[in-house]
Amino acid sequence: MKLTDSVLRSFRVAKVFRENSDKINCFDFSPNGETVISSSDDDSIVLYDCQEGKPKRTLYSKKYGVDLIRYTHAANTVVYSSNKIDDTIRYLSLHDNKYIRYFPGHSKRVVALSMSPVDDTFISGSLDKTIRLWDLRSPNCQGLMHLQGKPVCSFDPEGLIFAAGVNSEMVKLYDLRSFDKGPFATFKMQYDRTCEWTGLKFSNDGKLILISTNGSFIRLIDAFKGVVMHTFGGYANSKAVTLEASFTPDSQFIMIGSEDGKIHVWNGESGIKVAVLDGKHTGPITCLQFNPKFMTFASACSNMAFWLPTIDD
């Protein structure tokens, strides 16, 4: 089944899970699309089975809190940041609920975490105005970049370069093998800073970069030229909430939730809004991602919703 405007318009909530007592701050699908794992401000980690459509288990990180949870490439392991007493990144085995390793170094809260799509490397960005490069096999930081402001960062789909959005005004591209030489490209955005950048993602084909903000617009940028291709708006976000924007796996569509529980979908090429879907969420949709392998997506406030299309194209 191919994603089209009409298939996207047909998506409806198939299941809602109420496992959390506070907002879900992040979730991540496993690379095979079979599970999704969430982190919440209630200090819990919930693992869901996407095929059965049910929660499998719940773990807790009461002391440190849990945010920015990401699957690694090894089965049943995740990395996540703390949102309580320290700024160390933790590497957890879900199998026996034990920490494999800690990654200390940041002196302020970690606000971005991206796992390499190809190996055990990951990057983290912090309010201490640095991006750190790590390897899961070592607790020592493998590289450090000092920036002029708060960073958002992500690997490209090949795992060869990473992009850093700095100070909500420029995107810098680094070659992973020679990042210490500085960025090989810098794109300055000529825009009035009415809001902060809260996320940065590459499309799966590597051609586009999506910048999410805590305002009521997101930007789609050409990853090679740094040109803004589209600015998408017209969704509700009056309280400057961090709303996650995402690409569909075919790189063709862009989705974002809103504070009123609706999901807005645009065609990336034409820039036209193709759908507004009502998730009937009780709060702002802080997390939204399409499953990498199956025709389903998930959205979350303090509840988690799984969506399915209602037509067969």
From Swiss-Prot:
Key word ATP-binding present in the record? no
Effect of gene knockout: Embryonic lethality after embryo transplantation.
Q: Does the keyword Transcription regulation apply?
A: yes
GO annotations under biological process? Answer: DNA-templated transcription termination; gene expression; lncRNA catabolic process; negative regulation of DNA-templated transcription, elongation; negative regulation of lncRNA transcription; nuclear RNA surveillance; positive regulation of transcription elongation by RNA polymerase II; RNA polymerase II promoter clearance
Can you say where the WD repeats lie in this chain?
Answer: 19-58, 105-144, 146-184, 192-231, 236-276, 280-313
Q: Which cysteines are joined by disulfide bonds?
A: none
* Family annotation (Gene3D superfamilies): YVTN repeat-like/Quinoprotein amine dehydrogenase
Subcellular localization, as worded in the UniProt entry: Nucleus; Chromosome; Cytoplasm
Q: Which UniProt keywords apply?
A: Chromosome, Cytoplasm, Nucleus, Repeat, Transcription, Transcription regulation, Transcription termination, WD repeat
What's the domain of life for this entry?
Answer: Eukaryota
Q: Which CDD domains match?
A: WD40
**Principal localization?**
nucleus
Q: A GO CC term?
A: chromatin
Molecular function terms, GO-annotated: chromatin binding; lncRNA binding
Which InterPro entries does the entry link to?
A: G-protein_beta_WD-40_rep, Swd2/WDR82, WD40/YVTN_repeat-like_dom_sf, WD40_repeat_dom_sf, WD40_rpt
- Function summary: Regulatory component of the SET1/COMPASS complex implicated in the tethering of this complex to transcriptional start sites of active genes. Facilitates histone H3 'Lys-4' methylation (H3K4me) via recruitment of the SETD1A or SETD1B to the 'Ser-5' phosphorylated C-terminal domain (CTD) of RNA polymerase II large subunit (POLR2A). Component of the PNUTS-PP1 protein phosphatase complex, a protein phosphatase 1 (PP1) complex that promotes RNA polymerase II transcription pause-release, allowing transcription elongation.
Oligomer status and interactors: Component of the SET1/COMPASS complex, at least composed of the catalytic subunit (SETD1A or SETD1B), WDR5, WDR82, RBBP5, ASH2L/ASH2, CXXC1/CFP1, HCFC1 and DPY30. Component of the PNUTS-PP1 phosphatase complex, composed of PPP1R10/PNUTS, TOX4, WDR82, and PPP1CA or PPP1CB or PPP1CC. Associated with multiple protein complexes including an RNA polymerase II complex, MLL3/MLL4 complex and a chaperonin-containing TCP1 complex. Interacts with SETD1B (via N-terminal region); the interaction is direct. Interacts with SETD1A (via N-terminal region); the interaction is direct. Interacts with CUL4B.
Similarity-based family:
Belongs to the WD repeat SWD2 family.
Name used for this protein in its record: WD repeat-containing protein 82
This chain's source organism reads: Mus musculus
